[in-house]
Amino acid sequence: TENSGVYKLDKNKTLTHPIEKGNITNIYQDSSKELWIGSWEYGLYHIDSEGIIHNMRHDPSNPNSVSSDFVRDCCEDNNGNIWIGTFNGLNRYQKSNGRFDVYTAGHETESLTHSSIWCIVKDAQGTLWLGTYFGGVNYFNPEYEIYTRYKASDTERDGLSSSIIGRMIEDKDGNLWICTEGGGVNVYYRKEGTFRWLRHEEGRNSISHNNVKAIYYDEKGERMWFGTHLGGLNKLDLRTNRFTHYRMKEDDPHSLPSDIIRDITPFHDQLIVGTQNGVCLFDPETETCQQLFKDTREGQAIKMVADLFVDRDSTLWIAATGEGVYSYRFDTDKLINYRHDSTIPNDVDNHTNSISNNNVNSIMQDSQGNLWFSTSGSGLDLYHKETDSFENFDMQKNGLSSDCIYEIHESSFKKSCLLLITNQGFSQFDVPNRKFHNYSIENGFPLTAVNENALYITRDGEVFLGGVQGMISFHEKALFFTPKSYNILLSRLIVNGKEITPDDETGILQYSLSYTPEITLQANQNMFSIEYTTSNYIPANRDKILYCLEGFSNEWNSVQRGQNFITYTNLNPGTYTFIVKTQREDIKAVRLKIHILPPWYETWWAYLIYVVFTGSLLLYLIQVYKSRIRLRESLKYEQKHIEDLESLNQSKLRFFTNISHEFRTPLTLIVG
């Protein structure tokens, strides 16, 4: 009721009054048949399966209570959580722990546009649609909220000290140590969900520089080692919480060769340190440094080190920017350089003796002993030790999103799978099938830019990725979801630059384009665009869209990123079928038959006129021809007749001449 709470009328028509006060705004029954009742001013009522009524009110001292006593709507998601729209925020109630998680409007693009929620509706895909008081409509799907975000904060306990994240490592207690650019080192206490910052403080025992590029955890010695940019090497004694700094000294050959440290990796009881000026072997006990390879021609080319790795055979691999990869054996003092050589062809197995690019970002050895190299511009290389050859995987051959790979790790969840970060996001590589699956902002990946080396997998399988907008984490298992079904719709038709609407002056559409199976266009309407859309609003559920115009071309074309208009121009008259589909067989393709009429001079009645006119002309010409033939024959006959008469006259004349001659001769004789 509006002011008297809730009344209950049972099967026996007995009326009771279980909730006696409150302006009731909403009654919702969840999948467990439990009731959730929203009220204005008296919070949320929950009637459980036993019929017990629980009144949940806002408690300013409890951050896990409902955010407001003014509740407008309730809805259950597909995970069994109850979402409550209130005057001051959206609340998620988890039955398992009885706590409320509150979401309010913020400056971030992924936050609510307004905190006052009026209504909540769940669609067939499980997406929740929120009507706000002054922020329009918001939507999201809780099933696909698999990423946890960590952002820079002004408060140490609540977030990162810097939004630019680098290398990470886990300690024995499961805490994550994070290198940042400009914010020192952050420690994330995963169990508590809190942070601690280790930043440079002038005049105090602290890290020497806030731009930290390398990290190594010595569990046995209970020490953390940090490599900084311009601050040299730092040791943190975890027992005393004190820092020791190691810097380059011009007059000391046993000091660091540079204060710019790029990577640190252990070797027996020593540390191999990669710097901006080569590689050195650092002894933590004597605190002295021995620079490697400085006396060899090959070694002098090693300057800017991108990554270091010691494989299971104790071979040191060095990624040197612009110089390819080096392998070094300490026992034999043998240094080998692997460089790119474009003149060396690939064999039948796509193997070559040349690495694909001289700029290698990271090196990794998987559980099978395979060595992998990520490059800046040529994708991923696999080193085959038995043949001393490389196999390359890239965008063109294998579907990688970008050929610039920053870091590689082996999956802890899926066998024979690699995880990679690129300058386009995050990718999984199925090694047996030689195929990549890519994640980017288009399919729900939350980071627009991933940083170098900022990929780490914890012992319990949680994946952490860092970028220039903070850090995210997720579990690989969450990436393998059952795709949701949806529909493809044709939404708009534009002909010769003008949008066509039902029953307009063109007469092309009588109904909405989505409900129109075929259209007819005039001859001068052969330039048109068709807009498509889908009922899918889940980024992670997006599929590749393909289209084809049968009658024009049977080739399937893929839709480019951000494109939802498909245009055709100067089509010949005829009948075509426009088809839009996805690569998934369970999504029904949409079809539109298009008839383009010919111009009037190509219509059937025009051709009939042409035939009649041509036939009549032919008949006329035939008649004229026949008349001329008859006239010619008549003239010939007359001519022949005249000639015959002339011949007859001549014959008569000759006859009479001869007769007269015959008669005249005797008479002449008689007269004579």
Set out the residue ranges of the language-model regions.
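Loop/turn residues immediately N-terminal
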Residues: 3-6, 41-44, 88-91, 133-137, ...
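Primarily the dimerization/phosphotransfer
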Residues: 634-672
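Residue-level detector of Asp-centered blade-edge/turn motifs that repeat once per structural unit
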Residues: 29-32, 76-79, 122-125, 170-173, ...
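Cytoplasmic juxtamembrane amphipathic helix immediately C-terminal to a transmembrane segment
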Residues: 230, 622-638
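Conserved beta-propeller blade signature
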Residues: 35-36, 81-83, 127-130, 175-177, ...
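Residue-level "micro-hotspots" composed of small/polar
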Residues: 19-25, 54, 58-71, 101-118, ...
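Short loop/turn segments that connect beta-strands within beta-propeller blades
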Residues: 10-13, 48-51, 94-98, 141-145, ...
